[in-house]
Amino acid sequence: MSSEDGIKKLLDAERTAQKIVADARQDRVQKLKKAVEEAEKEIKEFREKKDKEYKEYESKYLGASSETASQLATNANKEIDTIRNETAANKQKVVDLLIKYAITCDN
């Protein structure tokens, strides 16, 4: 009977060990799933934070660049108008000077 008792104890020990291993595997799977969920949550939060920062940066600097471009265009148009007005005002004087120097010859 002692050999049967020994075999029975070994089988019980093996079942207990298998149960412990199965529980450990199940625990590992659950911990892994939990870790993946937490990582995905952190990634989502990080992505949302960076998207928000990017949109703030974009609105701050791209808005300013369109304003700057508009201001530069306005200034350029003003300068062009000024040059055209000065050209129109001085055109006749320049033509007269050119004619005067073309007609007058100094030896």
UniProtKB/Swiss-Prot annotation:
Keyword Transport included in the entry's annotation: yes
Gene Ontology terms for molecular function: ATP hydrolysis activity; proton-transporting ATPase activity, rotational mechanism
Pfam family, one: V-ATPase_G
GO cellular component, as recorded: contractile vacuolar membrane; phagocytic vesicle; vacuolar proton-transporting V-type ATPase, V1 domain
InterPro entries the record matches: V-ATPase_G (IPR005124)
Residue stretches spanning the membrane: none
Keywords: Hydrogen ion transport, Ion transport, Transport
Role noted for this protein: Catalytic subunit of the peripheral V1 complex of vacuolar ATPase (V-ATPase). V-ATPase is responsible for acidifying a variety of intracellular compartments in eukaryotic cells.
Family: Belongs to the V-ATPase G subunit family.
Subunit structure: V-ATPase is a heteromultimeric enzyme composed of a peripheral catalytic V1 complex (components A to H) attached to an integral membrane V0 proton pore complex (components: a, c, c', c'' and d).
PANTHER family per the UniProt record, alphabetical: V-TYPE PROTON ATPASE SUBUNIT G, VACUOLAR ATP SYNTHASE SUBUNIT G
Protein name (record): V-type proton ATPase subunit G
Organism this protein belongs to: Dictyostelium discoideum
